[in-house]
């Protein structure tokens, strides 16, 4: 959804994409993550394997995930261009997920609107 609603329609080089693969399902491993790169083939995308889930847990602390979850996975963030990354990730300007059916459930059009808003404020 993010690929076709956002990346295929927003061609700006101001958009930077970081795809973090983390082991959640039993079949998740580094090889599966390598194969999954095809899911986000955009040239602006950089792919990372979060083997120990440390980034997923750090990102999970920046927002309130549904159902008391602590690990951010199937979560999509928009960060302001001025966001500073240090020992802990910054708070996102906007985010959505695919973890539950609530007001932050991923909606490609809404997410695209927030990406466009973010690149206009740069």
Residue ranges and their predicted role:
Residues 29-31, 59-60, 88-91:
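Short, solvent-exposed loop/turn and secondary-structure capping segments
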Residues 3-4, 33, 56, 112, ...:
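Extracytoplasmic/secreted envelope proteins and their assembly/folding machinery
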Residues 4-11, 52-53, 60-61, 120:
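Sec-exported extracytoplasmic/periplasmic mature domains
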Residues 71-122:
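Thiol-/selenol-based redox modules, centered on thioredoxin-like
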Residues 12-17, 41-46, 73-74:
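Loop/turn elements at helix/coil->beta-strand transitions in domains of secreted/extracellular proteins
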Residues 22-27, 51-56, 83-85:
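Solvent-exposed loop/turn segments at secondary-structure junctions
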Residues 37-69:
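Short, internal strand/loop/helix patches
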Residues 1-38:
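Structural microenvironment flanking redox-active thiols in thiol-disulfide oxidoreductases
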């Amino acid at each position: 959804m993010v690929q076709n609603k956002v990346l295929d329609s927003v061609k700006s080089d101001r958009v930077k994409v970081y795809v973090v693969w983390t082991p959640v399902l039993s079949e998740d491993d580094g090889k599966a993550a390598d194969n999954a790169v095809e899911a986000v083939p955009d040239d602006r995308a950089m792919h990372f394997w979060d083997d120990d889930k440390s980034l997923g847990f750090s990102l999970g602390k920046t927002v309130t995930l549904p159902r008391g979850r602590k690990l951010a996975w199937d979560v999509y963030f928009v960060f302001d261009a001025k966001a500073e990354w240090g020992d802990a990730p910054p708070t996102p300007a906007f985010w959505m997920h695919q973890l539950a059916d609530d007001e932050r459930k991923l909606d490609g059009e809404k997410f695209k609107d927030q990406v466009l808003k973010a690149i206009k404020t740069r």
